[in-house]
Amino acid sequence: MRALSALAITLVLAAVAAPALAQGPPDPAARIARQQAAMKALSWMDGVWRGPAVTTRAGGQKITVTQTERSGPLLGGAVHVVEGRGYNPDGSTGFNALGIISYDPDKDAYSMRSYAMGQAGDFPLTLTPTGAVWTIPAGPATIRYTITARDGVWHEVGERVMDGQPPMAFFEMTLKRIGDSDWPSAGAIPPN
């Protein structure tokens, strides 16, 4: 009798699960279309940018570099890739970072995967009427980068924010758009 009950339960579970197993994976086209539509809000970033950037270190020492950014869509416009380089006065690279910005339709939220100075992380990015804000948790503080884009100028300010204290600016760059770029989508390897 027990064996018959176990068999009956197995058959019922198999019958219930069969329709779900028969379905294939969901068609990604609608999801990708939502990602592509959301990423159009960042199309102002596309191209090549250059200008001064100043970082203020602890103790007030200022480091000035020539900052460049190149930015563009990838995966058919479903993600946005940004590379930043800071050049020292002697022309050497003093800073290099890579960011991949994506949109999650399930969460209706943007995020940026950032790689810089041997570190990596996923950070929330929020669009604003004039650009974007992205934040990095840093112990009791939050590092907040506020980007303003207007008339071919990319202005970004980095601040250290702690509860009960005014934000402390430690980074500022003002870049001008100097041209178009087919990076990163150009140069794909052909099939033969």
Region annotations inferred by a language model:
Residues 1-8:
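Bacterial N-terminal signal peptides that target proteins for export
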Residues 9-10, 20:
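Cleavable N-terminal signal peptides
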Residues 22-192:
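Hydrophobic small-molecule pocket/channel-lining residues, especially in calycin-type beta-barrels
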